[in-house]
């Protein structure tokens, strides 16, 4: 049997319990077709980069699968039919990773607090310029412009 990593996105308006029910449903499909599901991770509700089927957020779920290709095809067929699944992707892998996935360790942009120093870091000073005084941006009067050559 081949090893796969499978990720799917579920609609934002279903509950976390319904997402768990979807995972169990697809786990049952894999096991009914002679496969095994190892690690299951629910990454929670995350913002999408762009809208998918009028959704701005989605529930993400990851499954490590050890199954024959026919089981994967049947699971993907049922996902295409389901209105709750926005997208899915199955990738064949050499071996499953140990420990939590990188996405589980990564925090969503919405979960982060404010950055230190506001939007920008501290202002840098350059060695060849005098230090700027905040609020006073005048550097003296500008010299007169030279006449343009095309109008002379």
From Swiss-Prot:
This is Small ribosomal subunit protein bS6. It comes from the Bacteria. Belongs to the bacterial ribosomal protein bS6 family. The gene is rpsF. The keyword Signal does not apply. Binds together with bS18 to 16S ribosomal RNA. Keywords: Ribonucleoprotein, Ribosomal protein, RNA-binding, rRNA-binding. The keyword rRNA-binding applies. GO terms for molecular function: small ribosomal subunit rRNA binding; structural constituent of ribosome.
């Amino acid at each position: 049997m081949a090893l796969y990593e499978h990720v799917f996105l579920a609609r934002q308006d279903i509950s976390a319990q319904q997402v768990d029910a979807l995972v169990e449903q697809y786990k049952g499909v894999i096991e009914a077709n002679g496969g095994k599901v190892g690690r299951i991770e629910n990454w929670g509700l995350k913002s999408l980069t762009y809208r998918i089927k009028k959704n701005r957020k989605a529930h993400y779920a990851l499954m490590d699968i050890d199954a024959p290709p026919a089981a994967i095809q049947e699971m993907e067929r049922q996902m295409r039919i389901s209105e709750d699944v926005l997208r899915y992707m199955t990738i064949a892998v050499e071996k499953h990773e140990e420990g939590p996935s990188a996405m589980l360790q990564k925090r969503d942009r919405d979960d982060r607090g404010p950055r230190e120093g506001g939007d920008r870091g501290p202002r840098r000073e350059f060695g060849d310029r005098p230090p700027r005084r905040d609020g006073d941006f005048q550097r003296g009067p500008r010299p007169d412009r030279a006449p343009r050559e095309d109008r002379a």
